[in-house]
UniProtKB/Swiss-Prot annotation:
Function: Hydrolyzes dipeptides containing N-terminal aspartate residues. May play a role in allowing the cell to use peptide aspartate to spare carbon otherwise required for the synthesis of the aspartate family of amino acids.
Protein name: Peptidase E
Source species: Haemophilus influenzae (strain 86-028NP)
Cellular compartments per GO CC: cytoplasm
Signal sequence interval, chain numbering: none
Annotated localization: Cytoplasm
Source organism phylogeny: Bacteria, Pseudomonadati, Pseudomonadota, Gammaproteobacteria, Pasteurellales
Catalytic activity: Dipeptidase E catalyzes the hydrolysis of dipeptides Asp-|-Xaa. It does not act on peptides with N-terminal Glu, Asn or Gln, nor does it cleave isoaspartyl peptides
GO terms under biological process: proteolysis
GO molecular function (one): serine-type peptidase activity
Family assignment from sequence similarity: Belongs to the peptidase S51 family.
């Protein structure tokens, strides 16, 4: 059974790193205590892989699991193949996807998750689980071989969604950017995840977790809203 937890962000309001996600992760991974999580740190542009791994190990120590970054493997896919759970951290989605292709991890992650290995990711790690990364918010832009992502979730994801414009900001709002995307890609669906929200995916069903409803935008910016604790098919 496909089992994924897609988190909008690593923090919510004034909480510590991944602190608000711990109750969800403890429930999500209740049967995996003592098992191994393969962690993919590629999105962390401003820190080393070792630093990112240590940050996540400290934040998730209460899970009682062994968190190992893929960069410790002779081949990075070795760590993925041996792991009980797969996790991808947030940061820069372009850098993340580029290195997933470079290290030949796309197919092995897709295969394992489709065959029941639990997957969780936040921010870029949620974005890359979708159909493509074409609704990322990120800079700098590096060029992966394709914008097609893991396609574990068949639609677009936009993490860190904030509605409207900040005072003094004269550029496009997030809604305006997504409307432009849907003009160019009219058959797409975009799931917008506000801060502090998450989707728990089980096969073709999704449950909304967190503090804010999740939005789904389609052609002409038709908007569906999925309230907290709602379960829906996608």
């Amino acid at each position: 059974m496909k089992n994924m937890l897609l988190l909008s962000s690593s923090k919510y309001k004034n909480t510590g790193y991944l602190e608000h996600t711990l109750p969800w992760l403890q429930n999500f991974l209740a049967d995996y205590r003592g098992k191994t999580i393969a962690f993919v740190p590629y999105a962390g542009v401003s820190r080393t892989f070792d630093e990112y791994e240590k940050t996540v190990q400290n934040a998730l120590s209460d899970l009682g699991m062994n968190i190992v970054s893929v960069h410790h493997g002779k081949q990075h896919r070795d760590i993925i193949e041996q792991a009980d759970v797969i996790s991808i951290g947030g940061g820069n989605t372009f850098c993340l996807l580029k290195q997933l292709y470079e290290h030949n991890l796309i197919d092995i992650i897709r295969e394992k998750v489709n065959n029941g290995t639990p997957y969780f990711g936040w921010s870029a790690g949620a974005n890359v689980a979708g159909a493509s990364i074409m609704t990322t918010n990120d800079m700098p832009i590096t060029y992966p071989p394709s914008f097609q992502a893991l396609q574990l979730f068949p639609h677009q994801i936009n993490p860190h969604f904030i509605s409207g414009k900040m005072q003094g900001h004269n550029g496009e709002s997030r809604e305006e950017r997504l409307a432009e995307f849907l003009l160019v890609n009219p058959t797409a669906l975009v799931y917008a995840l506000p801060e502090g929200s998450a989707l728990h995916i089980q096969n073709e069903m999704a449950t909304v977790l967190g503090e804010n409803p999740i939005l789904c935008f389609s052609e002409n910016m038709e908007c569906g809203t999925f309230d907290i604790n709602t379960t829906f098919s996608y």
